Amino acid sequence: MPTVSPTPTPTPTPTPTPTPTPTPTPTPTPTAEPIVLPTSFENLFERRKGISLAAWQKSSEVIKASKNKSGAFEIITGPNTTPNFDDYPTPISLVSRLFPARSEPAKTIVIRYKYVDLEWAETTLRSKLTAEEFTQLNRNEGGKAIAGRCDVSSRNCRGAMQQTTIAGLSLIIQGVPNEVDKSDPTSKLRFGSGMLEAHEYFHSLQRIPIMGAEVWPHAWFREGSAEWVQNMAVNYNDYKTYQEFLAIDCAGHCARLSEADIVEFLEKSKENYTPPNFDPGLNYNLSSRFIEALVALKGPDTLINIYEQMGKQLTFEQAFKNTYGVEWSYALPILAKTIYANLKD
């Protein structure tokens, strides 16, 4: 018989010892630097990142703690006009609550119209005023109280204005555009959220302390205040949208200015005068940034206090010192430097 060779027993292959997986080093989550709120002109520039939050927080708290005290409203809309925004009481009540200690008109008449209703608006305005009141109002508006809100060439009405009669009746003449201007990034919010309504109504609060005094703060203060108030009132519960509007509102002309330009704008602007080398729109968009800084330091009521002071025949410079505690000549370069830096950051 053949000899059977034994089957060799295989040598076991040693199991490799697993290499331990190194424990990953945790990447620390970056800690956002806390926003420090400005408290004075002395630290306004250093704490400029906190300006928006300070102004918004102070004002939001006022609105939430206050009640609406606005007077009666008569809102008249042209027969062929459909407004972009039709909840008039809401923005009005928010402006009222932002200024709880301030007087408001006992009655406001609002006339809203598209270009197609131009003649209707003229007739309606005449029917609501005495002949003397209409003449005075039309004279104040260069004979174009109604037509002045519209552009004849494009047959479109985008303007609005507020006036107060000698008897204290508040009038808001409000052109309604045929369509929202898609080339203007602010149009959707301005015409569709209640901002325009808040803006014009605030002008009526400005007028009350200076009725009969024939004095006005600088144009940038007047319109910058209304531009800031419209944003604050509508967005008192939405800080993100408040910030977004600030950014897009100033993304054009004001973003291209140098610090020296801003100083010149503030130095040369007067009651109803804007230096000819500056776009009049700066009285609104850029100037709302100055106003925001002032509110961040001293609160929203100061915007009317300036008018109250000037109603006593004080100059803007005197009223500013009484309200904000420093000379206007001292505050001006600080505001210019601060706002310029925030626009560039």
Predicted regions and their residues:
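Surface-exposed helix-capping loop/turn segments at secondary-structure junctions
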Residues: 98-106, 211, 299-303
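Non-catalytic architectural context of zinc metalloproteases
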Residues: 28-186, 190, 194-195, 273, ...
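Acidic/His/Gly-enriched intrinsically disordered linker/tail segments
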Residues: 212-287, 297, 307-345
